[in-house]
Amino acid sequence: MQKEISRRRTFAIISHPDAGKTTLTEKMLLYGGAVQLAGSVRSRKNQRATTSDWMELERKRGISVSSTVLQFDYQGYQINLLDTPGHKDFSEDTYRVLTAVDAVVMVLDAAKGIEAQTQKLFEVCRQRGVPIFTFINKCDRPSKGAIELLDEIESVLQLKPFPVNWPIGDGADFKGVFERLAKQVHLFERTTGGAYMAPVEVGDILDDFVKERVPGETLAKITEELEMLDIAGAEFDSDEILAGRTTPVFFGSAMNNFGVELILKGFLHHAPPPQGRPSAGKFIEPSDEQFSGFIFKIQANMDPKHRDRIAYIRICSGKFERDMMVYHSRTGKKVRLASSHRLFGKERETVNEAFPGDIIGLVGHADFGIGDTLSTDKTTNFHEIPRFTPESFSYLHNSDTGKFKQFRQGLEQLLQEGAIQCLSLKGSTVAVPVLAAVGPLQFDVVQFRLESEYNAVSRLEPAPWQVMRWLPAEFSEEEMDKLSPPTGSRFGWDSERNPVLLFASDWAASYFEQNSAGLNLSRVPPNQKES
């Protein structure tokens, strides 16, 4: 089993929207041999869409709205690659993915450097001590200087950058990269639409083909920069990389396949295999005999013909075997894992065995929820996955009374994914769902999917609240009646029947907290610690 563990690499790709995250994902699949022809997020109708953006809404909008698992073998490695949504409204899904990986590839736009969402996701990685590999993308467009980008990584993220390779030229004159550890030049040629692997010439910086294709002043400039890096730059230290204090930096252009193979190979060589995890007072090593794993994502309706739901489980220890019996931590019951699948975007195939680091899909278990532990050892219970505090609220009206059954069934299944909550309001006599989410785009996703997947048309109506706080767990309706929150506030319960109080503004929430001595209002549910 140790051999299987050591060849696993489980990682996510993160970035600010439009930095090229999903494009890099697709090109890694191309170079990894998992696809023969790479699609593009911004592809025209007669071209292929990306493998990871399989949902109809993603294809229409050209953005990722849900994380995707892609598994493939490459040069002896078993790769579990997770593409994540970039937009902040989907950050809760991305955060859950980051609990399930052992390393991260951070994509930066060479023209923009570190952007807001990148910084937020980086902080999550830092808290978890996850190693970070950096790909500076779009070097074939007008961009910041390479040294400026390294300085930005160090000053903004407090992360020591080690450039594994160095760009030769920039913008329209970007020719390739110099690989510092191997001391080799890689010069690329463009392919039509970037759909195929880019032809590349590899050799010494003094070779004739380099002098023919790269202007003398460009060669002189990078020679000077490389000397400066050797004198002043950080050393390549594997321990510092694995500790998350140093980030290897790769330059390239995902759209044109420049440098993609180099980061794929570099990452696989230097990234860690599956790591151990804390669980209820003990530490679970991947090599432990007892099987264990946790559910970090639920996807409803992946197969519209069967209206099924898939629970994504990260295997942490032991060997998974189809039909095995395990304990379900939240219910204490024993369950049989009969329908298990290997995942590749929307595609799936039955898997009979899997090992630590693998992500597999389990079908047919309505009781499974996000954060649940499954294990052959009843005492194993991994830390719960935190929920984000909702900041957007909306009523969701069913537009067709004749389709109420489809509307209700669809909403119930989409709620199980955990991206949105359905609130119950105290004293409400109208059966209109009140949705709560991290951002308003989540509501658009629900509305679109209800119509496209369940044939249920709905209408969104903005709700008048901006802030939600949790009351103590046992807070009763009688106790609610004794309070006088600001005008526009509303008492209610979240999807797990925890009492909440909704406010029209941050000011109203702060005012009420300051004038309610002894009342403990929380930004997280009662069973979750505030970070």
Model-found features: residue ranges?
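Structural and coupling elements of P-loop NTPases
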Residues: 1-531
